[in-house]
């Protein structure tokens, strides 16, 4: 997950750069998996989850989204 300030954890979908990146990854996995991004209810985190067939690639994409969210919302 992406560690962010608690008051900004719900803002990830309002940031155009983050939203565009998430949409691009969703299109990439369309039909072969799914992308789920959500704010944690109990921690100052935005959870980044991707499902698909290539675990190494999924991990790489999830880390890059988490890093982007941390950079933009910290």
Language model: regions and residue ranges:
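Phosphate-binding and adjacent anionic-ligand microenvironments
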Residues: 1-74
């Amino acid at each position: 997950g992406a560690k962010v300030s608690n008051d900004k954890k719900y803002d990830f979908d309002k940031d155009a750069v983050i939203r565009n990146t998430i949409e691009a990854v969703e299109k990439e996995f369309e039909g072969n998996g799914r992308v789920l991004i959500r704010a944690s209810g109990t921690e100052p985190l935005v959870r980044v989850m991707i499902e698909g067939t290539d675990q190494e690639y999924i991990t790489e994409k999830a880390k890059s989204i988490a890093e982007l969210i941390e950079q933009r919302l910290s």
